Structure formats: structure tokens, C-alpha cells
Design a protein with these regions (language model features):
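Preference for the N-terminal adenyl/adenosyl cofactor-binding alpha/beta module
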Residues: 1-274
């Protein structure tokens, strides 16, 4: 993947993170009365419906768990918002990549106008009565289906999936993911890896290093040292470890000499007899 494409992915990732974190903070504050740096509300507000009261209880339990692990009120909210944004972004990015490989019908590329959602709506006309015409339900059905094989990312029981972007934020997020200059990236296997890396900005990494010369917690350890490994590096390492071992075991008589482009070998190499 060239530098220009990586730059586009980085910009989109940073924009998407900002969009989602702003949205989820506003939801925590305005809907659930959960504010960074302040004690958690003991009871859900009277303005919440039954489903929102359930979500409120789960949010409080999740934040209390973070508190028990050593986070203060501010850090607990910050951590939750970051993880919720990370999970939502990566799920929709994964759907874009599945679309590019024709493994799912178009579901994100045109938002609610996607052909996959249109077919889904045709099977359940009652969805038109929902505020978003059932688009969220459609995406969650896709998550549940994919979670059978990729549970670690798509499991909706994950506390990081308690919040969902409202209409305006979802439209903004989809617009970011569907930028024309980003279209080429979705067919690339490396894209999801670069999104993982760019979610933590270099400015954030530098700020951590200025505050402490060594990582102070598990997140800082990951942010400081977690870098995506490009395909060519993986291929070189694999070709010259496993590939090289097999090459020597077969005394050079193997198809790997043609298949492993990074395998270091000489045409006239000699091998000791077994």
C-alpha cells in the first residue's frame, strides 16, 4: 500500500474517531447523566424508557468495573468512550471490506439506500415504523451473523457496543467511510490494520512519552509499542523462517523457490546429506 493511500486512511480514521467520541460523550452526558470526572448516578433518570434504563445500568456497571481496576471518574469515562468509538468504527470498516470482497451485499456504501438494506426492508415492511426505518436493526443483524465466526469484534454483548451513533453522527461517519478517495483502500487486506494503528494518533503517543519515560499502564504500553506490520515485512519474515526451513529440508527441491518471492537462496546452494 502506497504512502498516499495510508495518508487517506489516517485522515479518515482520525475524523471518524473524533466524530464517534464526540457523539458518545454527548449521549453519556445528555441522555444518561454520566459525566467525566463526576460520580456515577445511582439511578437512571425518569426521562429514560425501559430499554434506555437497561443500557444505563450496564453503562454504570461497566464504568464501575473500570473504577475497580484503578481508573478515576475521568479516566473511566474516557476509556469507555474510546473503546466504544474504536469498536463501532472497526465494525463498519470491516463491513466495507466485506462489501469489497462481495462477502456481504452492499450495506454501508450507500447507507440506508444500500441494496442490502432495501432487500432486508422488503422482507419486513413493518420496519418503516421505526425512527431510522430499521437501518440499525439491519446492521445489527449483520453483526450477529458475522459474529458466529468473528465473535471478538462483532459480539453485541460487548459493553463497548451499548451505545449507537444517532442519525446525524451516523450519517457523518458513513460519509467519512464512503469518501471517494478512500474507495481503493477497502479491497486491500492491510486497511483494517492501518485503521487500528491510526486510531491512536502520533500526537497522543508523543504526549504519553513526554509525561513519562516508561509506560504507566497497559494502554500506554500498547499505544507506544503497537505498530501495524506491512505485508512485505510479514512475507519476508515468513519466507525466511518457515520457508527457509522447508527449503533446506527439501534440499532446495520445492515449489517455494517460485512461490516465496522474498526467500533468500542461491541457485547453486549445497545441502548436507541427512
Amino acid at each position: 500500500m502506497d504512502k498516499a493511500t495510508r495518508a487517506v486512511i489516517q485522515k479518515a480514521t482520525e475524523n471518524a474517531r473524533s466524530c464517534l467520541e464526540t457523539e458518545f460523550r454527548e449521549q453519556l452526558d445528555g441522555r444518561y447523566d454520566i459525566r467525566a470526572g463526576r460520580p456515577l448516578p445511582a439511578e437512571p433518570g425518569a426521562h429514560l424508557d425501559a430499554d434506555q434504563r437497561r443500557i444505563h445500568s450496564q453503562l454504570v456497571a461497566t464504568l464501575e468495573h473500570l473504577r475497580l481496576r484503578g481508573a478515576n471518574e475521568q479516566d473511566a469515562v474516557d476509556t469507555y468512550v474510546r473503546e466504544a468509538a474504536f469498536t463501532t468504527l472497526n465494525r463498519l470498516a470491516a463491513l466495507k471490506m466485506l462489501e469489497a470482497r462481495a462477502l456481504v451485499k452492499p450495506c454501508v456504501s450507500n447507507g440506508p439506500a444500500s441494496t442490502g438494506f432495501k432487500e432486508f426492508s422488503g422482507l419486513a415492511p413493518g420496519l418503516q415504523e421505526l425512527p431510522d426505518k430499521g437501518y440499525r436493526l439491519y446492521l445489527e443483524c449483520l453483526f450477529d451473523e458475522i459474529a458466529v465466526e468473528v465473535k471478538v469484534l462483532f459480539d453485541r454483548r460487548d459493553p463497548a457496543a451499548l451505545l449507537w451513533p444517532r442519525d446525524a453522527a451516523l450519517a457523518e461517519l458513513l460519509a467519512i467511510l464512503n469518501r471517494p478517495e478512500l474507495a481503493i483502500a477497502w479491497a486491500e487486506d492491510e486497511t483494517i490494520g492501518w485503521i487500528y494503528q491510526y486510531f491512536n494518533s502520533s500526537a497522543e503517543r508523543e504526549a504519553m512519552r513526554k509525561q513519562s519515560s516508561v509506560p504507566r499502564n497497559s494502554r500506554e504500553l500498547a499505544v507506544r509499542n503497537q505498530f501495524f506490520t506491512p505485508r512485505y515485512v510479514v512475507e519476508f519474515l515468513t519466507d525466511n523462517t518457515l520457508g527457509r526451513t522447508w527449503y533446506e529440508m527439501r534440499a532446495g527441491q520445492t515449489r517455494l523457490t517460485d512461490q516465496c518471492q522474498s526467500l533468500v537462496h542461491e541457485p547453486d546452494e549445497r545441502f548436507d546429506p541427512p
